[in-house]
Structures are given as structure tokens and as C-alpha cells.
Amino acid sequence: MAIRKLAPVTPGSRFMSYPGFDEITKSEPEKSLLVPVKRTGGRNRAGRITSRHMGGGHKRHYRIIDFKRNKDGVPATVASIEYDPNRSSRIALLHYNDGEKRYILAPKGLKVGEKVESGEKVEIKTGNTMPLKNIPLGTDIHNVEMRAGKGGQIVRSAGAFAVLAAREGDYVTLKLPSGEIRKVRVECRATIGVVGNAEHENIVLGKAGRSRWLGIRPQTRGMAMNPVDHPMGGGEGKSKSGGGRRHPKSPWGQLAKGLKTRNKKKASQKLIVRGRNAK
């Protein structure tokens, strides 16, 4: 996928870039797989902001994605590659031989007309899904389950892939995109290949208005606030943090630079072989 740069006709378009839509083969989504999305603006039912910097944006429909890939033994044909406004990757519409239609994440290199399948003993091919115990070591995978049958939860964004590094007993060892090395049960499923649209990370929004189209509101620096609104607010002029002065903090007083916040008593802690920030 090539990135398309705009001519510097206006200040906003000077550095703006858009993804190329060459791989997209259909402009209208499958209506039977759409559900409406109710926008919250980051508010809970009491009307209070619980997620900051959210609001506005273009109206969207949610595409129901098959993260479980549990339709075993029934081959499917890739009918189209489509744009999904709710995620960074593209999605592929599958037509199964029994007539059912489902969306999946579109891996890199998947073409319209190709066959994909899921099951215990399927071919090692891009787009096929199977348990981790049947995938060869060194294979690039995505849409990985954390619990068998729950559906893929990690490695789902554009250009992401994990590497199957080792297999021992009831667990396999995965190297994740973050750098974390983690164990997962061999019964968990994953899809072969790398998630498509890898150039997404190089896109430049170019102007504030384009963030608003995406539903992202402006972010105010804590130092620019009053003391009542932020631990780093107030002071005469620019009262810097660090160097014996105030340490940077989150709006709720949590130390912001490098403090580990994960609970070490979590049961899944023993499954992390090496953390993502380990040297």
C-alpha cells in the first residue's frame, strides 16, 4: 500500500498524507454484518467524563469481525477487501461454502478469490487459523487468543505480527510486537500471516481538524492548568518538573515517568517470560 501525499495548497495539507486504497475492492459494506455505534463522548451514564479527549467525529457503523474463527472444516472464499473506520487494518469479507458471510482481519498478501479455512489440521497458509500446537516454530502469526475459544485478543492492529518462538509442554512462547515474550496455552488459536496495511503508522494527519473527524479532542498540558485541575498546574510562569523540582504526574497524582503500575500478584504474571521494557 502506497501513502499518498497532498500538495501544499494550504498549511493543513502541507505535510498531510493519506493511505492508498489500492487494495480495497468494495466501497459498500455487507449490511447484514453492520450494527450501529452509539457515541458516548467519553462520558459514563452519569454524564461525567471517564475517558478524556473523546468526542465528535464522523458517524460510523461497527463491522462485526469474526475473531474466533471457529467455523472449522468449511472453506471460505475471499469476496472483497474493505475499509473499516473502527480499526487501523483492512478487513476481508468471506463467503463460506454453506452460504454464511463473515468479516476477518485482512492479512498482508490476501487476495480476492483466494480460499481460507480454519481447523485443527489446515494448510499453513496466510489467512488460515489453527491451534498454536499445530503451527511451525518461527511462523509469523496474528489475531492470537489468550484463552482458548474466547477469540483473538492481541496482535490485531495494522502491520502487527507475533513470532512463535518455542513450544514446551502445554505452552508456546510468543514474541509479541511490543517486545514482550509471553507464554500462551497450546490450545489457543492464531491466524497465519502479518496484519495488512502496515504503512498506517507513517500517515500524517496534518491538521487539528482531521483529528476531530476521528473523534479525538484536544489534549491540554497539565502545566497549563490550574492547581485545582492537575498536580502539575499553577506556579509563576513555566515552573518546570524534574531537576529537584516536581516530578511529572498524571492528572490523578500517579508518577508519570517509568513507574510500574502492573499488579505483581496477577495470576498471569508467571506467563510473562520477559517484559516489554526489559533491557
From Swiss-Prot:
GO terms for biological process: cytoplasmic translation. This is Large ribosomal subunit protein uL2. It comes from Chlorobium phaeobacteroides (strain DSM 266 / SMG 266 / 2430). One of the primary rRNA binding proteins. Required for association of the 30S and 50S subunits to form the 70S ribosome, for tRNA binding and peptide bond formation. It has been suggested to have peptidyltransferase activity; this is somewhat controversial. Makes several contacts with the 16S rRNA in the 70S ribosome. Residues 259-268 have a biased composition (Basic residues). Gene3D superfamilies: 2.30.30.30, Nucleic acid-binding proteins, Ribosomal protein L2, domain 3. Keywords: Ribonucleoprotein, Ribosomal protein, RNA-binding, rRNA-binding. Part of the 50S ribosomal subunit. Forms a bridge to the 30S subunit in the 70S ribosome. Residues 232-242 have a biased composition (Gly residues). Pfam families: Ribosomal_L2 (PF00181), Ribosomal_L2_C (PF03947). One of its GO terms (cellular component) is large ribosomal subunit. One of its GO terms (molecular function) is rRNA binding. NCBIfam families: rplB_bact. PANTHER family: LARGE RIBOSOMAL SUBUNIT PROTEIN UL2M (PTHR13691:SF5), RIBOSOMAL PROTEIN L2 (PTHR13691). HAMAP family: Ribosomal_uL2_B. InterPro entries: NA-bd_OB-fold, Rib_uL2_dom2, Ribosomal_uL2, Ribosomal_uL2_bac/org-type, Ribosomal_uL2_C, Ribosomal_uL2_dom3, Ribosomal_uL2_RNA-bd_dom, Translation_prot_SH3-like_sf. The keyword Ribosomal protein applies. Residues 222-279 are annotated as: Disordered. Belongs to the universal ribosomal protein uL2 family.
